Amino acid sequence: MKLRGLYAITDSQLLAGKFLSYVEAALEGGVTLLQYRDKSSDEARRLREAEALRDLCERYKTQLIINDDAELAARLNVGVHLGQTDGPLSPTRALLGYKAIIGSTCHAQLELAEQAAREGASYVAFGRFFNSNTKPGAPSCSLDLLDEAKRTLHLPICAIGGITLDNAAPLVAHGVDLLAVVHGLFGANSTAEVTRRARAFNELLKV
């Protein structure tokens, strides 16, 4: 499966009161991967929202990814994104099967990406590249890291962290396949603006 394009990530606080309408607006503009990210302990609501997103993604032929919850991903038969505190990737690959999309957070360390690749990751994510509202304390990445990753890794590379339409072009120029965006996509005043931004990100990536 070729993974290239916009990687939209939800934020429950940012999308409060407009969750599904803004997500559908993004899908209308074109989303390669949609990550459901919710750190709350309300499992019933998380299941309800994830099921709604799965149905939307099926309609728009977009792949749904669950953040940090392999069991929920298995229940819905979708992909998962794992952080460095979530343990080794191999058991998750065994749980979800060889076709599932599994991503791995690698911060600013190429070694973590190489390990994730060996364990069966579908893509690796580096970041943050810019100041991030979602993870303000995350270590920062350089464009040089992207160059090195492109030379040594043979799987899609995702960039995350404070990405907007104004700063994304250099990341694409240095070989990024997936632009993971939260506020730069969903921090809009209308659904029409969300759709416009999604299309503009895809134009940058020539998708």
UniProtKB/Swiss-Prot annotation:
Keywords linked to the UniProt accession: Magnesium, Metal-binding, Thiamine biosynthesis, Transferase
Record Pfam families: TMP-TENI (PF02581)
Enzymatic class: transferase
The record's free-text note on cofactor binding: Binds 1 Mg(2+) ion per subunit.
Sequence positions that bind 4-amino-2-methyl-5-(diphosphooxymethyl)pyrimidine: Q35, Y36, R37, D38, K39, N67, T105, K135
Taxonomy, superkingdom: Bacteria
GO molecular function, one term: thiamine-phosphate diphosphorylase activity
Gene Ontology, cellular component aspect: cytoplasm
Family of this protein: Belongs to the thiamine-phosphate synthase family.
Protein name: Thiamine-phosphate synthase
Gene behind this protein: thiE
